[in-house]
């Protein structure tokens, strides 16, 4: 079975109960299945908390965090440091052989600066699969933060959904975007089981899909088109359904290519 990229986000990273549920499901799945799994994560809530403590402003444009040069070290520490090693510690606690990485390790993704206006914010494209294949073949669980490195050697903050898309493209893997939302909702607040690009754009135009969810949906659409396969947006809150998700069943909203 092809690898599955699991993108983790939302408040899961700061929620012990949720982490326990997620890693319990992961542990149970790994004991009975051989499908290679890769975790890609952000950690916006941790960054927001740290910025507040440091009394630094949080500015977002089109769902992306503006990252000035004097803040990239702080954000790198939060994502590639605290968030990544927290997930690694949870993997270790549950007997999973985790390896903490960022997008720059082994050139997993090629990262370029988006614009001067956004600062150290990067766009990720597929990189080299060699390191991940080496780790997966040896039975490791890669845990990848969304911090990248440009060809000029600059640290870049990459949207975690987009980072996960690039890793999925690198491996030719399936992708699920796992967060604190159960999927995409229609205008009546009902969850959609699946959605096409045309329908998604209509919901954006109507103001039903907004802010960070636009970035999430666009990342899923881009991945679905590139991978030529559906991509799912789902919630980690339904721990009892996670094993089904890992097996390819729909528990959220499936984005059609």
UniProtKB/Swiss-Prot annotation:
Domain of life of the native organism: Bacteria
Xref: SUPFAM superfamilies: Carbamate kinase-like
E.C. number(s) listed in UniProt: 2.7.2.8
A biological process from GO: arginine biosynthetic process via ornithine
Site keyed Transition state stabilizer: positions: 7, 216
Residues binding substrate: 43-44, 65, 157
Residues that, per the record, bind ATP: 180-185, 208-210
Catalysis performed (reactions): N-acetyl-L-glutamate + ATP = N-acetyl-L-glutamyl 5-phosphate + ADP
This protein's pathway: Amino-acid biosynthesis; L-arginine biosynthesis; N(2)-acetyl-L-ornithine from L-glutamate: step 2/4
Database matches in HAMAP family: ArgB
UniProt-listed NCBIfam families: argB
Protein name, per record: Acetylglutamate kinase
Gene behind this protein: argB
């Amino acid at each position: 079975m092809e690898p599955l990229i699991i993108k983790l986000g939302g408040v899961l990273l700061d929620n012990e109960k949720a982490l326990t549920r997620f890693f319990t499901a992961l542990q149970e799945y790994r004991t009975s299945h051989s499908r290679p799994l890769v975790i890609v994560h952000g950690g916006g809530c941790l960054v927001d908390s740290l910025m507040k403590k440091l009394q630094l402003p949080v500015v977002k444009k089109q769902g992306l965090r503006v990252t000035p040069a004097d803040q990239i070290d702080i954000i790198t520490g939060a994502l590639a440091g605290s968030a990544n090693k927290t997930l690694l510690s949870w993997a270790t606690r549950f007997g999973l052989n985790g390896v903490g990485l960022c997008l720059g390790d082994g050139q997993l993704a090629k990262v370029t600066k988006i614009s001067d206006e956004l600062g150290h914010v990067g766009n990720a494209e597929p990189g080299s699969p060699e390191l991940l294949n080496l780790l997966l073949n040896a039975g490791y669980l890669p845990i990848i933060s969304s911090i990248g490195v440009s060809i000029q050697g600059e640290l870049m903050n990459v949207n975690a959904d987009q980072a996960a898309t690039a890793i999925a493209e690198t491996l030719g893997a399936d992708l699920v975007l796992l967060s604190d939302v159960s999927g995409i909702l229609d205008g009546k607040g009902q969850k959609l089981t699946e959605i096409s690009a045309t329908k998604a754009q209509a919901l954006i135009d109507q103001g039903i899909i907004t802010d960070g969810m636009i970035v999430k949906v666009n990342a899923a659409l881009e991945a679905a088109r590139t991978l030529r396969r559906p991509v799912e947006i789902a919630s980690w809150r339904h721990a009892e359904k996670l094993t089904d998700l890992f097996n390819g069943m729909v528990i959220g909203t499936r984005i059609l290519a």
